[in-house]
Regions:
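Alpha-helix capping/helix-boundary segments
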Residues: 33-34, 91-92, 99, 151-153
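An alpha-beta-alpha
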Residues: 71-112, 218-233
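Periplasmic-binding protein-like
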Residues: 19-31, 82-87, 118-119, 139-152, ...
Length: 239
């Protein structure tokens, strides 16, 4: 049996079959695509979206508020213009998610016209990421790379190491999620961090409401704090 939504390729039909084969009183869905959350919101079984692209979908859930405007502004103040966000494809298709739209708006505010270079579609596969990085570094290498997951970050660090690219000397590197792994890195990876207690309390309250037969679809979010770390710095000088 598949162990995650990623193993199911966020395929609504496959997920629907899995749900039908495993009856439950309620579902908690982690970091799902918009299409998946739309499907769950239309089912009679209560569902909770723990993160994921759920803007305007009538489903209970929680999320994180990361101030990408401040992050992008700080990068631009250090001379960065070639800023790239590597994000899952479901944030880009069939339409931009709230998160991807916020990144575009942050670029526009500082005078950068966003395009496919800044938000590339790469298929969320290891080989797709390598092809994407090859393309980015072929002509106009990015001066700042923003990632969304530790697996993507590790792949980028491996790619950099094989080519003698270092952060922050050659490119600033930021991950949007925290990880205990970062404490083992020297320099520590720049990232966002947040308190999960309020998010977990909300899940417990939702579960209690579901047990009482209440139709609870409230969404909450918590504010993340930017941890600068040591992988972000000024644009490298031209060689």
């Amino acid at each position: 049996m598949p162990k995650s939504l990623l193993e199911l390729d966020m395929d609504v039909n496959r997920i629907a079959r899995l749900v039908q084969q495993n009856p439950a009183d309620a579902w908690i869905i982690g970091s799902a695509s918009r299409e998946v959350l739309e499907w769950f919101s239309q089912q009679p079984t209560p569902a909770y979206a723990y993160f994921g692209n759920k803007a305007d979908i009538p489903i209970a859930g929680c999320g994180i508020r990361r101030d990408l405007h401040v992050l992008v502004r700080n990068l631009v103040e250090m001379g960065h213009r070639r800023i790239v966000l590597l994000i899952r494809e479901e944030h880009l298709k069939p339409k931009l998610s709230f998160f991807a739209t916020m990144f575009q708006e942050a670029l526009e505010i500082v005078g950068i016209t966003p395009g496919p270079y800044n938000l590339p579609v790469w298929g969320y596969k290891p080989e797709g990421l390598r092809r994407c990085l090859d393309s980015l570094y072929q002509i106009t290498p990015p001066t700042a790379l923003i990632t969304t997951e530790i697996s993507i970050l590790l792949s980028i660090r491996d790619y950099q190491a094989q080519r003698g690219i270092m952060s922050p000397r050659d490119v600033s590197l930021i991950n949007l999620d925290p990880s205990p792994f970062f404490a083992w890195c020297d320099p520590m990876v720049a990232h966002f961090s947040w308190d999960t207690k309020s998010l977990n309390r909300r899940v417990v309250r939702w579960a209690k409401n579901v047990a009482l037969g209440k139709d609870d679809r409230r969404q909450i979010s918590t504010t993340a704090k930017f941890i600068k770390g040591g992988t972000i710095g000024p644009v490298p000088k031209a060689k």
